[in-house]
Swiss-Prot record:
Protein purpose: Late protein which probably plays a role in virus entry into the host cell.
GO terms of biological process kind: symbiont entry into host cell
Cell compartment(s), UniProt: Virion membrane
Biological source species: Fowlpox virus (strain NVSL) (FPV)
Protein name, as recorded: Protein I2 homolog
Organism lineage: Viruses, Varidnaviria, Bamfordvirae, Nucleocytoviricota, Pokkesviricetes
GO cellular component: membrane; virion membrane
Membrane disposition: Single-pass membrane protein
Signal peptide: none
InterPro entries named in the record: Poxvirus_I2
Main location: virion
Induction: Expressed in the late phase of the viral replicative cycle.
Entry keywords, A to Z: Late protein, Membrane, Transmembrane, Transmembrane helix, Viral penetration into host cytoplasm, Virion, Virus entry into host cell
TM segment ranges: 40-60
Amino acid sequence: MEKLFTGTYGVFLESNDSDFEDFINTIMTVLTGKKESKQLSWLTIFIIFVVCIVVFTFLYLKLMC
């Protein structure tokens, strides 16, 4: 990882710091394989909500009998 930073730093010596930071963030994202996905988080919230409704409905019906 240090070799990557050292090699790419020489290319960006004369450019803006923000360009270098954006490039490093892009490289880190590619290397770690992390993807930002807001759709997945909404899907997770929806599934948890549905599971809660099912559990509460089951408990309500169980108490009624």
